[in-house]
Amino acid sequence: MSEMKIVVTSGKRKTATARAVIKPGKGRVRINSVPVEIHQPELARMKIMEPLIIAKELAEKVDIEVKTWGGGFMAQAEAARTAIARALLEFSGDEELRKAFLEYDRTLLVNDVRRKLPKIQGGRGARARRQTSYR
């Protein structure tokens, strides 16, 4: 039996996590068992498609299955694009593709570490304070 190359990678954004499984195939991409072509909203779909457009020839030769959980829909989309880009890079081992990803957007390969500041007492949020009266 021939060895089938399967690569599993993950990506994170805020509290969202995505796991991508990539294997040789016909170019099918599914996000939570839904084809990426009908994934809603459109802005999230465009974010997910970015690494696939950059790695055009490779993306047509592999099937990608992405499972996302946690966070909001946009954070899930950004976690999914990171997972897809890492999977494509690990599957191909192409240094040119790595340079193309980094040149386009560094967060395709590196998780965005920004987090929400916690709310502090004396106000409604992390920075906003209650109005004070001095007379």
Curated annotation (Swiss-Prot):
Pfam families: Ribosomal_S9 (PF00380). It comes from the Archaea. The keyword DNA-binding does not apply. Gene3D superfamilies: 3.30.230.10. One of its GO terms (biological process) is translation. The keyword Ribosomal protein applies. GO terms for cellular component: cytosolic small ribosomal subunit. Keywords: Ribonucleoprotein, Ribosomal protein. GO terms for molecular function: RNA binding; structural constituent of ribosome. HAMAP family: Ribosomal_uS9_A (MF_00532_A). Belongs to the universal ribosomal protein uS9 family. This is Small ribosomal subunit protein uS9. It comes from Archaeoglobus fulgidus (strain ATCC 49558 / DSM 4304 / JCM 9628 / NBRC 100126 / VC-16).
